[in-house]
Amino acid sequence: MILSEIGGGVLAQTVANQIFIIFLLIGLGFFIRKIKLINDGFTQGATNLIIYVTLPAMVLASMDRDFTRELALNGLIIFLLGGLMYAILSIIAFIFVKVRKINDDSKGVYLYMIIFGNVGYLGYPIMSIAFGEIGVFYAAFFNIWFNILTWTLGVKLMSKDRVSITKLLLNPGLLATLLGVVIFFLSIDLPSTVKTTLEMIGNTTVPLAMFVIGAFLADAKFSSTVKNKELYMASLMKLIVGPLLMVIILFSVELSSTIKAIPIVMSGMPSGVNTAIFARMFNRDYKLASQGVVLSTALSLITLPLLLMIIL
């Protein structure tokens, strides 16, 4: 269901219901981790399952639809708006590290933290909850940028290593999106058994992802994080300044409310888990990166509902 097409009172109730569902799922994940019903092995395994299996299945299922010029044009617009978002966040990030005089050892972490949000792991489930399958369809076009930039610009920010073309091309999110685009533009009808299987697998993404985020927050050590004001300011840039600039720009142009809403919501996603993964991979400040991801994720439980209520 596309929220922007619902009447005022029903819209407000629908948004409230979806936000409540998110809180319930994350809260349940937090609780079952605290009582040790799940362990680190489960959360790591679930993370891999989401990245390599359920998210690609969700994307492919959403792309199996009849080709229309309207959908294709909207997908192209969403793709271009994704580029705009990354340009805006990059400018914000570089201004931030310059004004705050961030040291060279931490600069790459802060830049990555602000530029790259959790647009896949959290973004797709939020799009599914808020907009239904069409939200996932459009988000796939939007996330082409992430899948390319994270293995090009992202690697450059965290390391002096050369960009790995192999890792770029074997990225499961990019592969699923490109295959889905081919399926859509060539109007390939997947067999009903395949489509149903993809849908069933993809439908597990939302609860799994929310559980893992809840478990992630349950394991977080906030004592040292709360003392770092730079992390708060970086989270402010990521969760508030970036989305507000997108709101100002997009609400000044003539586009459907859904096409406006998707890039704005995606711009408000917290720092991606890849921030910590890349920091560890390239011997950067892993502790700082982890604290940034935890803090922005925790704060997004406040900012994302507010953002959804403002724009939908």
Language model: regions and residue ranges:
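Alpha-helical transmembrane segments of multi-pass small-molecule/ion transporters
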Residues: 1-312
